[in-house]
């Protein structure tokens, strides 16, 4: 099959690289220095799956009008703030794409894609896979889970095109599953990245990492308060936690616990992670953006909970204060 990655940064390079290594035909659209390095030296990926040097089945270009031929799947992976610019530049691809999906963070992006390319050509997708650009031609893959990607029709159900992309990801070593309700996966993923990112960026400052905060009572209390409020919204939408991205997901365990029990659970989780990973400490990408002085995705990752809570009439003071803290800093950051 032929894939086109629109926004081949860290995650796009990781996913596209593994697909190409498994024999799929992949076209990357990305920044000039990175694309030139891939053309000249191939793509190097390091991380949880070991070290890989991919040299076959890849075409690297810097603009959509340089991409040739038809594509079975167009995967959108630019930052949320860059979506409109990317779509405007990619109009030349519209007649040549059979199906389109977004692996970006957030809720609601699929409706924008339906407006752009047509309702029937957009499918739902979600991944927790981690990807960071280390330099031109080099990407890190620091995070994965046994099932790292989910695909489904946005109106429900599993079709052949859903099965085909699921099988392609599986062949590439990216554990994937087809699901009947992709919207539930998207919302649960948002709870996961929203709680971790909101907590990390609003509580841990410039020096601390996730595990550092979780092992303290005050840090664990703040995290539990945030998770409980986000899960209240998730429940109000008619969903029950499934731990789609286990073992990273712990919502099925935290959800039924009382506040104090949940705090103890999170503190134990923090101690386990400190012992398990030692000096390999973790921050969310939103927190990293804040530390490095770059615009964050706070409006993509946290604001949907603020808006949905207002719509549903649910009080979420921790979510709201978390959003305000990060948004205030975000106003002064560079794009």
How should each PLM-predicted stretch be described?
Residues 43-60, 193:
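N-terminal glycine-rich dinucleotide-binding loop that anchors FAD/FMN and/or NAD(P) in oxidoreductases
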Residues 183-211, 218-231:
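Active-site-proximal catalytic alpha-helix in oxidoreductases
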Residues 1-51:
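NAD(P)+-binding Rossmann beta1-loop-alpha1 motif at the extreme N-terminus of oxidoreductases
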Residues 52-140, 150:
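Rossmann-like NAD(P)(H) cofactor-binding subdomain of soluble oxidoreductases
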Residues 69, 109-189, 194-195:
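Rossmann-fold dinucleotide-binding core
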Residues 94-97, 138-153, 201-215, 283-292:
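Helix-loop-beta segment of a Rossmann-like dinucleotide-binding subdomain
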Residues 224-335:
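NAD(P)-dependent Rossmann-like dehydrogenase/reductase catalytic/cofactor-binding core
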């Amino acid at each position: 099959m032929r894939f086109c990655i629109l926004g081949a940064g860290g995650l796009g390079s990781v996913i596209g690289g593994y697909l190409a290594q498994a024999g799929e035909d992949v076209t990357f659209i990305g920044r000039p220095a990175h694309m030139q390095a891939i053309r000249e030296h191939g793509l190097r990926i390091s991380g949880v799956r070991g070290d890989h040097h991919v040299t076959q089945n890849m075409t690297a270009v810097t603009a959509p009008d340089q991409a040739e031929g038809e594509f079975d799947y167009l995967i959108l992976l630019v930052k949320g703030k860059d979506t409109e610019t990317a779509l405007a530049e990619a109009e030349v691809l519209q007649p040549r794409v059979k199906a389109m999906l977004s692996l970006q963070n957030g809720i609601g992006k699929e409706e924008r894609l339906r407006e752009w390319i047509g309702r029937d050509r957009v499918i739902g997708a979600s991944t927790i896979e981690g990807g960071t650009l280390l330099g031109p031609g080099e990407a890190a893959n620091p995070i994965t889970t046994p099932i790292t990607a989910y695909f489904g029709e946005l109106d429900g159900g599993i079709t052949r095109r859903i099965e085909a992309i699921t099988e392609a990801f599986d062949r590439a070593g990216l554990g994937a599953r087809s699901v009947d309700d992709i919207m539930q996966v998207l919302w649960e993923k948002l709870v996961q990245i929203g709680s971790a990112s909101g907590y990390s960026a609003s509580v841990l400052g410039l020096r601390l990492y996730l595990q550092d905060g979780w092992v303290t009572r005050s840090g664990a209390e703040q995290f539990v308060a945030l998770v409980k409020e986000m899960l209240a919204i998730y429940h109000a939408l008619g969903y029950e936690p499934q731990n789609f991205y286990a073992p990273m997901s712990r919502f099925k365990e935290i959800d039924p616990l009382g506040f104090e029990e949940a705090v103890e659970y999170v503190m134990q989780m923090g101690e386990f992670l400190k012992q398990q990973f030692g000096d390999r400490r973790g921050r969310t990408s939103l927190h990293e953006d804040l530390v490095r002085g770059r615009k964050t995705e706070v409006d993509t990752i946290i604001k949907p909970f603020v808006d949905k809570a207002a719509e549903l009439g649910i009080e979420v003071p921790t979510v709201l204060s978390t959003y305000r803290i990060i948004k205030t800093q975000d106003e002064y950051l560079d794009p």
